[in-house]
Amino acid sequence: MNALKNDRYLRALLRQSVDVTPVWMMRQAGRYLPEYQATRAKAGDFIALCKNTELACEVTLQPLQRYPLDAAILFSDILTIPDAMGLGLYFEAGEGPRFKSPVFSRADVEKLPVPDPEMELSYVTDAVRAIRKALAGQVPLIGFSGSPWTLATYMVEGGSSKAFTKIKKMMYAEPTVMHLLLDKLADSVILYLNAQIKAGAQSVMVFDTWGGVLTGRDYREFSLHYMHKIVDGLIRENEGRRVPVTLFAKGGGQWLEAMAETGCDALGLDWTTDIADARRRVGNKVALQGNMDPSMLYASPERIEQEVSTILQGFGTGSGHVFNLGHGIHQDILPEHAGVFVEAVHKLSAKYHQ
């Protein structure tokens, strides 16, 4: 594998010195880019795009051709594991992801297979290998998965949800079934992320998109416990260097201390958490990623730069910060505004690393 020309993203995750704060964007390969729209049209639909190695590689690289980003992230979806378990993933126009066969009972959970990443999910590992080759050491490649709790919400609800009544019913009325499902998902995520690492992912991220809908006690029992299990089960060194692990829980700002105890290297912050406060609380244990409100990219270039400056100032001097949005970039953002954001991070952060 090629030596990395730019490793500041990996260095920042390990709180090692960097020249400027590294930056990438969640959903940086996405619908706000006209070139992505063109490639997606070529694929036919989103799932076909994810499963086409050549096109998934193409869209992963598109934002790097536009912006001086410090990392690439595998183009895929968090729901690949439940799809590989046979739940029948499809996308309903205006509705988001749906499953043909949601999970309702103990029998449903017991019959779920743990997918073999090099069989049912080989399109993902093939894409990782292709992207690593195409990157040629330009920047590191991030692999990722949904967290067991977040995957379970989609599997039990049958898709997206606002109230999460079905999964909370399972959690409170049948906790043993809930734990059986989460345990199986944790095993699947470990295999899946380790396969991505073996295929060439240089860092991995676990997205707990719906962790924030739980009480603190339930979060520890039904989400964090399984994230801890995943961190313990991951390959932490490959190709002669550490493979950093980032945990991101949307709405999880109140649990940073508990999340930092998992042994992960970094925590992703959504925009509702104050980064200065987060650094005071856990900055001696983990790096922090984030955390500009993605909607700030609707603002003027001057206002975007001002917000970048405020967040950099909030984090303060030294390494241990990867700049990002607090969640995925919106599909109607002007690509030029994303460029202003990325360049502002590099331009304004150098003074914090002298």
UniProtKB/Swiss-Prot annotation:
Site Transition state stabilizer: which residues? D77
Its GO biological process annotations read:
protoporphyrinogen IX biosynthetic process from glutamate
Record's InterPro entries?
Answer: UROD/MetE-like_sf, Uroporphyrinogen_deCO2ase_HemE, Uroporphyrinogen_deCOase
Q: Is Protein biosynthesis one of the keywords?
A: no
Please report the organism this UniProt entry assigns to the protein.
Answer: Photorhabdus laumondii subsp. laumondii (strain DSM 15139 / CIP 105565 / TT01) (Photorhabdus luminescens subsp. laumondii)
Query: Tell me, what is one Gene Ontology molecular-function annotation carried by this entry?
Result: uroporphyrinogen decarboxylase activity
Output this protein's name: Uroporphyrinogen decarboxylase
Q: Name one GO cellular component term.
A: cytosol
Which reactions does this protein catalyse?
Answer: uroporphyrinogen III + 4 H(+) = coproporphyrinogen III + 4 CO2
| E.C. numbers | 4.1.1.37
Cystine crosslinks: none
**Predominant subcellular localization, coarse grouping:** cytoplasm
Instruction: Name where it's found.
Output: Cytoplasm
Q: CDD domains under this entry?
A: URO-D (cd00717)
Q: What does this protein do?
A: Catalyzes the decarboxylation of four acetate groups of uroporphyrinogen-III to yield coproporphyrinogen-III.
Q: Which UniProt keywords apply?
A: Cytoplasm, Decarboxylase, Lyase, Porphyrin biosynthesis
